Amino acid sequence: MAKAKKPGMQFPSILDRAYSEYKRHLKVSDIMTSRVVITTPETSMAKAARIMGERHIGSLIVVKYGCPIAIVTERDLLSRVLSGGLDLEDTTVEQVMSFPLIKICPDLEIREAARTMIKRKGRLAVFSCGSLEGIITASDLIREIPDAPETSLLVDDFMTRDLVSARSETPVAEVVDSMGKKRIGSIIVSREGKPDAIFTERDLLSSLLATGSGLDIEVGKISSSPLITAPSGISIHEAAKIMASKHIRRLPIAKKNELVGIITARDLVEAYAR
């Protein structure tokens, strides 16, 4: 005789298992962003930043003579231009872009794409028969991370525990300089001594550079608030679901009402790629 199910217990149905198995074998072509935004080597970083900010994207493919040759990202903008003391108008994309492109095929399974992303440390350009078909980012991957055994790993084993923070009244210029030198994509913003918001590379692009605003504004005025957090001990699959549903790429982790770390989309991809 079959044992009765305990109250509250849930068992995956055949459809659930089939769907999970289907997601494990998704191809790059199933999840890639096919609308690729391009720029040229001669474009100023000021214009490139405005394009990224207006489109709410973190990178542009660089095309020369009709051929994709490189990529320029929000991290290039932060670390090589702003933190490096360069002028946005005087600096061209060619001076800071990353090349060659990291190329993958559209029929590659997403876990292999994740492994390539972590190994090569960058966004992936999808090519078919020599033609650019799309781009894959960490955000694309976490939206499709399947509920498989490898995604039951805990965020605590992959998160960054050394949190960097700034007071809400700190000028953005100072925060950006710190982020660039530490090569991090976000900083926790505190108000009255308590974590209140988060300032990210995307906030810099969309809230400031896309509008032509200066960097002397207080960081607390353009940070993302309220602060979205998750409890310590959740799986990377659960963290990925939160990020995807909230449209965020960085998730602070809390334990007993205290922040103990932060997990990023790239951290989740690294865990999934193992």
Model-found features: residue ranges?
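Tandem CBS (Cystathionine beta-synthase) repeat/Bateman regulatory domains
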Residues: 1-274
